Amino acid sequence: ATGKSAYATKYNNVYGGRTNPNWALCWNNVAQAALLYSPNSSKKSVFVENQSGLIASKTQSGDNNFCLIDSWGSARYNTAHQMTGLLYDTIYGKNDYSSWANGQMKYILGNNAGSKCFVVGYNKYSSKYPHHRASSGYQGSVTVNAYTKQAHVLVGALVGGPADSSTSYVDSSEDYNQNEVALDYNASLVGAAAGLYLYVKNSGTDEEKAAQKVVPKSEVSSELRTI
């Protein structure tokens, strides 16, 4: 991008010999993003090997083909993998992962066997008990309050997601594996959503395009407006 060879040299010193990281983009492993933007075209094949390899090896065929990369924060890793796939398609003018990402996001939002949505406040299927002290308003042990109505709705927060399948997912603030929320979780959600907005705008069905709209202020809760 800069035309300065020093950056390419530095990159090759760090990632030149990098092989398949066999993991999704996350806060402590950015290899997949580095491979995606590599100045060395041969590294593109390593990116594809990792992207496609995880999809092939981690997909749950019995649960709407959800790609469950890890049982702790599965939705976080899934949306991160959506995002890198969408970036690849955008950068290289392909359509290798966009349709897959679209299906995975539908799963995240509730189109799954358990009818569970892993984005708080998104629809009637949304998780109601995220593992988040400030939004819960709980006083005392989270174990005692695990299913107590929370003081605030943490609208738009991505919870951890299923440890096994959508049908066995437990919506409990006590379960930090499945209901924890974090900044890196939402970073991948927003990144994937942005990529899918562009994908649907260009290649989506009429129904999908019609669903893309700016939410009017009248439909936004007063609590959300004050955040």
Locate the predicted segments by residue.
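Aromatic (Trp/Tyr) and acidic
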Residues: 1-6, 10-17, 21, 25-60, ...
